[in-house]
Amino acid sequence: FRVELLAGLCVSWGLYNMDFDDLIKEAQRRTTSPNGVYSAKIMWSSFQDVLIERLKPRDSSDPSGSSDSSQFPSSSLCLSILKAHFPDPRFLWIRRRNKVAQAISLYRASFSNVFHHRRQRKKNEKDPPPYDFTKIESKLQFIEECESQWQKFFSENRLEPLILYYEDFCESLEDTLLIILKYLGERAAERGIPKITPNLLKMADSTSKEWELRFRKEREGN
């Protein structure tokens, strides 16, 4: 639900002058699986700044009792807005144990504007940005804040998301998919999962590892 990705979808689908609500419906129509499953990846920043703000009815009242329209809606209102557009939502919360490595990846991706690399495409060989402790620390704080906000959203709505760790599905994608299918109640889980070749490649490299060691040493020294 990043704005630039949504704009790209509109162009690729040949859709113009479509409001956000209709775009969501069109995305569901085009990408829902034959057995009725629709999935979307939502980062907290997109959840806050794009999805909820654009889908929130202008005259909606906040169940928390807050009347300040300048404040981000309460967790209960956010959930009710989601349910109005995505009935019976199930939440898969993807986290990362090594948040320093995640912060380094985010810093590098933000600098190059390359957030993923597909197996079928030639790798973008842009030079990495210069090492910057302050900027990596800023990304780390951003990641921790986003995770804190998701935790608040789930806790206040008494939701129990399926928690998945990046490191685990990198180790065994098939095992992770089985866990997801069982969580969703899909019978395909009973038949097992064949070996899968991921479409996306890991972008971390030796530079990422060197930076992590350097960052941890500098952080311990502060």
Enumerate the language-model features and the residues they cover.
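Acidic-residue sensor for enzyme active/binding pockets
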Residues: 4, 147, 167
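Secondary-structure boundary motif
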Residues: 29-33, 84, 152-156, 217-220
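PAPS-dependent sulfotransferase catalytic core
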Residues: 1-36, 63-66, 122-137, 168, 196-206, ...
